[in-house]
Amino acid sequence: MNQTLTPELQKLLTQLSQHLAVAEKPSELNLLSLWSQYKIAKAKLVAATTQKGDWTEVDRVLNYVSPECLEFSTSSATLLLAKLLERYAASTTKKVLLYARAANYWGIEEELLSKNFYSRLFKNIPKSQKDGRTRKCFEKHEIEHILAAFASNEFVSKFSVFPHSHYHGYVQFLALTGFCPEEAIALTWADIKNGRIIVSRAYSQGILKETKTYESRNFPINSQLDKLLNGLPKTQNLVFPSPEGGYINQHNFGERYWKPIVKKLVATGTVGEYLPTYNLRHSWITRMLRANLDIATVAKLAGNKADTIMKHYLAAQVRDLVLPEF
């Protein structure tokens, strides 16, 4: 039996249908809204100092640019790069795009997006001034002394919350592989399989990102490396977690652990001079070249170009050099 709706009921049904239509309409996703979701998802994993510093800076920049720069398209991403370079330094532009790329990758994992629009923009950012990073390297016996100091907690302060030995495996891994510290920090047990290490990510300044070449590489595991990896605890997914269980903060590690140890070894005469953690990479590359491994192979293993190896990493240690006689 048909019944005529009263005006009041008809009005209620109209209002209900309008409400449902609004509720079912998907919200417009752009970089700013995705960035907000990304921060919520990562808040417990990222240091409070990073959130207060870097995240606040990214907030300020993204709220400044026009809406058309924040849409997910190749043209909008390119426009964003142009607008950032107009107003900000190259270093700030790079930082914002690093976070944009990280948020975009998270969006892909959450099935909110299907591609990353920011990965290929970095080659268009002007190079900043050289960082003054030295390419000198440690000799084999110096690395052995450094590793021994980490393992024995020889120089640990009574005020130190965590022992130096926690980082022994991490330092030994860097010495045996020539990995960038940020690559080792990002390494998970799932990346190690069939006698090889898959290098596809790097963790730096609170961001999990691609390697600096934007390409993954396979690194073979020899007997030394196999022994090290098999001796590490597998209590979580990260191969080299911090004492608290998250990602290692490389800056804090360098200032609180690496620098005090190496400087004390320099003072005792067992290490020739202080060099940063990154120089373990230079040391490995130089050692491979001295062992007559060809440059192309060393470059592939290190995730570098052959001409970069020739230009920057073939370090001559003059203080220990013995000239051949003719």
Regions found by a protein language model. Name each.
Residues K94-V96, E109, L113-K115, S119-P181, ...:
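Basic, Lys/Arg- and aromatic-enriched nucleic-acid-binding interface segment
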Residues L97, T188, L289, A302, ...:
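DNA major-groove recognition helix of helix-turn-helix
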Residues F150-H164, T177, F219, K234-L238, ...:
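Short, basic (Lys/Arg/His-rich) helix/loop patches that form interaction surfaces
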Residues Q15-Y88, A103-Y105, K263-K264:
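Basic/aromatic-enriched alpha-helical hairpins
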